[in-house]
């Protein structure tokens, strides 16, 4: 990447190509407490099993969350319209999924927010939120509130709080997700009857969801 950057800089200097910097202004839309009951929160698809459970945890804390469907080529093509193709592939998919959902007409832009994780470190995942901000603005959705999930206080929103109940249920969701992922992917290639592993997984997924809803630790430990 550094070699590519140096080559581009040398080419620009050789051909005397200079571009005036374009100032990008951005007003941060707020996600307020009142929006909890009125807004649908869109989340990009990153881990199908885990996010299905996290959706349940969010619901029990009063947030109406919708997880985007599995990624396909159309989401990638949509993302490339608003994100430079030299960013990491998950960022392209993430922006594409969200913009595609907003353009679908299934969600009212005035009653829709977006949630995304943010690492807050040196990883590019820290920049997913700014990329999404720019992508939504370019796509014609500058007023969509963005909620950042992180542990260092970046981009706080007054209407999204980490309550003890939410954190407990989220932790249960992640542990259940890891467990399901390990046992399902380990056994599915060797199933005797095609589809039987998925059927068993779906049964226990519903049991796990019920446990996340009631937050019963005795049931969880058993």
What are these regions (language model features)?
Residues 1-222:
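An N-terminal assembly and electron-transfer interface module characteristic of large anaerobic redox
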């Amino acid at each position: 990447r550094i070699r590519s950057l140096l080559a581009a800089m040398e080419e620009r200097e050789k051909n005397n190509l200079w571009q005036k910097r374009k100032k990008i202004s951005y007003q941060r839309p707020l996600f307020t407490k009142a929006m909890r009951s009125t807004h649908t929160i869109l989340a990009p698809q990153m881990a199908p099993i885990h996010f299905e459970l996290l959706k349940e945890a969010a619901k029990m804390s009063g947030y109406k969350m919708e997880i985007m469907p599995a990624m396909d080529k159309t989401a990638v093509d949509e993302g490339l319209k608003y994100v430079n193709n030299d960013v990491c592939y998950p960022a392209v998919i993430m922006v594409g999924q969200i913009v595609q959902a907003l353009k679908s007409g299934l969600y009212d832009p005035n009653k829709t927010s977006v949630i995304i994780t943010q690492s807050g470190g040196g990883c590019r995942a820290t920049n997913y939120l700014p990329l999404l901000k720019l992508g939504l603005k370019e796509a014609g959705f500058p007023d969509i509130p963005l909620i950042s999930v992180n542990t260092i206080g970046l981009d706080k929103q007054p209407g999204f709080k980490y309550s003890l109940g939410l954190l407990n249920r989220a932790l249960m969701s992640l542990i259940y997700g890891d467990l399901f992922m390990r046992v399902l992917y380990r056994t599915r290639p060797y199933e005797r009857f095609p589809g039987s592993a998925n059927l068993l997984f779906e049964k226990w997924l519903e049991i796990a969801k019920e446990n996340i809803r009631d937050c019963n630790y005795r049931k969880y430990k058993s």
